[in-house]
UniProtKB/Swiss-Prot annotation:
Keywords: GTP-binding, Nucleotide-binding, Repeat, Ribosome biogenesis. The keyword Nucleotide-binding applies. GTPase that plays an essential role in the late steps of ribosome biogenesis. InterPro entries: G_ENGA (IPR031166), GTP-bd (IPR006073), GTPase_Der (IPR016484), KH_dom-like (IPR032859), KH_dom-like_a/b (IPR015946), P-loop_NTPase (IPR027417), Small_GTP-bd (IPR005225). Associates with the 50S ribosomal subunit. GO terms for molecular function: GTP binding. The keyword Nucleotide-binding applies. GO terms for biological process: ribosome biogenesis. Belongs to the TRAFAC class TrmE-Era-EngA-EngB-Septin-like GTPase superfamily. EngA (Der) GTPase family. This is GTPase Der. It comes from Brucella abortus (strain 2308). GTP 1 binds at residues 9-16, 56-60, 119-122.
Amino acid sequence: MGFTLAIVGRPNVGKSTLFNRLVGRKLALVDDLPGVTRDRRIHDAKLYDLKFQVIDTAGLEEAANDSLEARMRAQTEAAISEADAVLFVIDAKAGITPADSTFAEAVRRSGKPVVLVANKAEARGSEAGMYDAFQLGLGEPCPISAEHGQGMPDLRDAIVELLGEERVFAEERQEEAADEVFTPAAVGALVGDDIEDPDAEEIPAYDATKPLRIAIVGRPNAGKSTLINTMLGEDRLLTGPEAGITRDSISADWEWHGRKINLFDTAGMRRKARVQEKLEKLSVADSLRAIRFAEVVIIVLDATIPFEKQDLQIADLIIREGRAPVIAFNKWDLIEDRQMVLADLYEKTARLLPQVRGLRAVPISGERGQGIDKLMENVVKTHEIWNRRISTGRLNRWLEGVIAHQPPPAVSGRRLKVKYMTQVKTRPPGFVVSCSRPDAMPQSYVRYLINGLRETFDMPGVPIRLSLRTSDNPFAGRAKKKK
């Protein structure tokens, strides 16, 4: 295995549950009693395309040096020293305790890279705990539910970002590209047609066997619950003309054309100024949590009064959260001049939500069941794009052509040099460009690259992340491949 992760944290935060999730079997004893795990346990683990070893540890305890708790703590400290990185687990539902703060300091002193894992994030009231987690100084918390398997894709991406692709895929790639520099000849090789895609089979971009998680959001009374009842074929959710009937984020299992779906109906999301009573504040927080655990978010708009300010705010939130949005223009049965109205709605979608070009939008009637299949076809396609992975070879062949056609501008009389590009994550697609002076790169050129990626690699309707950094040549230090 290429690297080792130690799962640490105070007792009863879900470390052993996460260990079992990563190992794929119930190897660790799990109970509600603190201190169930007394010895550190190490096992081969897998998280999607990542293969590694994981260490389950006793809960960190403050105790006298001659006590059992002290020996458990010593086991944990030994695990930290053996590991390449630490998964520091907190209980988002319970919030940050003094013990969390004490042992976060100990983990920081170890100098090991850390992913802050906010477990039990599916629970009501966990939102406050995740916000409080920032005070630990371990970076942004990664919300998961180890028990239910939610948030695992984000945990995978956090590990890759922490250790770097070269580290986490070291064994898989040690036989890959030669030890070269980015000379014109090397760039020419990248642009050639004879380079195989090393990632195509090694990292499958899409797994249609896993349930697709969909959140259905929108303003109050847009028809979200009616739509879900039509999908399920039963009156599972309370509906009516009164705005705000749905208080909680409610989940339901469904199957569409053989594809398993987890549906989340959410409370209607209002402007903050109108969120007065405590219960409604909790409902909005529940909706935000549903969005974060979803993969695709269907934004239900009332076609008779679309694109209110709240609609745009909801869409912007979904895009900033990196989820895959699809718009459903509901109550289409009430529209008379449908062809003209639809053309107008498509134009407004492109104009009012320019941050995601090609956003998919479908007219439906939740009450009559019209347009549901078309909506789901667009949901599945958007989900596939959201999971898309492009090999480094293809990206750099494209980048070389882009630079030749439109090089970066000169800043303060000095030309910016773009060296190479790689994809660092999916869900949504995220890319890193290595260049000479990242801070000086105009945002207009960054948008130019994003738009080019979207068009060339057929990625409409999903957020695309692109960051700039200064780094060494990605091929430096690799052993030259012998022919």
